[in-house]
């Protein structure tokens, strides 16, 4: 039996098993030159959307099966959301892959927009605004923290675990970064991506 098991296992590659559904997505951090100064482009999600309506985000979305790479997915979404041709979007390179506490595996890339003639898709984008890059580089974000906790549900077999506590159990916590600008506050996963980009940019600079 060991031989059969060994022959079977040697053909297998590791797969990632998770306790939660993982969504794979990609976003672009777009740079746009305005009056000789670089700005970072943000979108406000349309109120028509089912998920996170009205939230500030970078252009992006789910990675589709026909996307050649996560970078291609991010640029495709950027083109669709901002209403510009793909050839007006230059890939500058990869940032990092962020995994959120709720199971979003997010690949981020930096891009350069070679047109300011943006025609946002109203089905996805309610508003587009820009923030001067230097303003963000000079800012120290406000940092808050959230707990990640678990709680047994009704079908949990307490009878198998004598004395098991039914209360919430805090497992860990994580930092949340807030970047206020005018009437906007950039935070959440978008804030984490922004911080990742700014940290890398400062290292290069």
Give the residues covered by each predicted segment:
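N-terminal leader/linker segments that precede catalytic domains of diphosphate-processing enzymes
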Residues: 1-57, 62-94, 98-107, 112-117, ...
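Active-site/pore-lining binding-face segments in mid-to-C-terminal subdomains
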Residues: 139, 145, 150
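Short, charged, solvent-exposed linker or helix-capping segments at domain edges/interfaces
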Residues: 118-123, 140-141
């Amino acid at each position: 039996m060991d031989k059969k098991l060994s022959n079977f296992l040697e053909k297998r590659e590791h797969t990632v098993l998770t306790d939660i559904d993982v969504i794979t997505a990609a976003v672009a951090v777009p740079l746009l030159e305005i009056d000789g100064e670089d700005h970072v482009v943000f979108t406000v999600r349309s109120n028509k959307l089912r998920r996170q309506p009205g939230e500030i985000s970078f252009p992006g979305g789910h990675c589709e099966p026909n996307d050649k790479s996560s970078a291609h997915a991010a640029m495709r979404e950027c083109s669709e959301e901002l209403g510009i041709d793909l050839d007006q979007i230059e890939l500058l390179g990869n940032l990092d892959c962020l995994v959120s506490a709720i199971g979003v595996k997010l690949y981020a890339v930096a891009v350069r927009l070679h047109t300011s003639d943006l025609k946002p898709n109203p089905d996805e984008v309610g508003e587009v605004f820009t923030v001067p890059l230097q303003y963000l580089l000079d800012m120290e974000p406000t940092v808050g923290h959230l707990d990640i906790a678990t709680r047994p549900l009704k079908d949990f077999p307490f009878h198998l675990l004598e004395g098991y506590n039914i209360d919430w159990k805090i497992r860990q916590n994580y930092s949340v970064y807030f970047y206020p600008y005018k009437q906007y506050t950039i935070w959440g996963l978008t804030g984490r991506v922004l911080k990742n980009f700014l940290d890398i940019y400062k290292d290069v600079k």
